[in-house]
Amino acid sequence: QFDPNISDSMKLQARFGIPHKKRRQLWLIASGGLKLLTQIGDVWPASKKSADTVMPSENSKFGSAIDILTFLPPAISRKVNKFLHVLWSQNQEIDFSPLIPTVAALLLLYMEVPLAYISIQSMINKSRQDSWYFTLTQDQFLASVHAFGELVEKKSQPVSHHAKSLNLNIAQIGLSLFPVFFLPFMPLPVALTLFDSFVIEGRKVLY
């Protein structure tokens, strides 16, 4: 029996990494996918059928600058590509959200396609209100990256000064790394632990 509420203990557990066998259940709860599933049922079959009438487009990558799919096994990559096309066909108003493909790929590592779909759709719905998980336009994304640069400047001046001494722009580094959850630049278990907290607490954990 699933408990649809996010407890403090769940948040704490996520910070240390959710056990593999619990990720499917906790991601479904924390993303709001379970609640949406109880409200509208399994919408994957209808969404997939509708997407079959929509021409494939590069837009289905949601503006992703670094293609995480190249780091996945070919079979998984094809699965994610098809999944993203269906998702984009139902959310064509999103013009730029490069984090979405990475989140989709990570959800599909642990979830069946219908559950991953209802989970990420719930995350998109919540983000329309307050960008909790995703920025949904290019302007929102660039503003969040700029805010990250200002935060580093304020909270970690040594890091900021070191970056400047190397002629590096912290905001541009964030622009490159955030959409892929630092993959493939950190071990997958570490990235998954970060993702655990992201699903529960939103994109603020990336800063």
Language-model segment annotations:
Residues 1-207:
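Internal, helix-rich recognition cores of eukaryotic regulatory domains
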